[in-house]
Amino acid sequence: MKKAILVLAGLGLALTALAQGPFTCTTEGAKLRYMTTDAKGNETSTSTVDITKVISSGDIFKITQVVQLYINGTAFTKPIETVATVKDGDVVVDFGGGLALAAEGAGFILPKRMAVGLELPTGEVTVDVQGMKVKQDITFHKVVDKEELTVPAGTYECYVVERQYSAKMLGIKVNGSMKTWYARGIGAVRTDTYDKKGKLSSSQILTEVVIP
């Protein structure tokens, strides 16, 4: 169960400047580091997102991201690879075709033109990570706020996106919600995860951005 929850957190990361740039990092060789804490603020794991390849053609970018999860400094899973396509500033993340991951269902979309009140796509996705299938049904997906957020990596202007979901992992059904703060040129700056009662269960915070 713990592994499945960490995998979901890693997928959230893979969903990541210019004033009107996309809500993801487009610099090849960049590395984003995150820390995950429990509800009391105690560190439980860390993770990295490496931008390993960026291919551009006109206004279209294909960005390969590799996510690695760590517990006590030791890799917890094999790397998770995703490919994000940026077209006209909109970010579409395809969870299929990765090093340790395959998926069925709709991709994840972050539009260039964010606005409070904007409703984002919902739907179902089934992810197979190293033989472990995680089925997630997103039932609510909306931009709920815009605010400046300070994290260890810096201060960012962010849009806050709330997502409510029902997930099935290892035969166990989990209902919950997430709030993610997205910044242009970075992607996810912070993600708070809540249980079905709305109680905070974990936070994932950007601690460092390394640009080559």
Which functions belong to the PLM regions below?
Residues 20-80, 129-212:
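Acidic, serine/threonine-rich low-complexity disordered tracts
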Residues 1-4:
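Positively charged n-region of N-terminal signal peptides that target proteins for export
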Residues 10-11:
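Short, linear, compositionally biased motifs with a strong N-terminal bias
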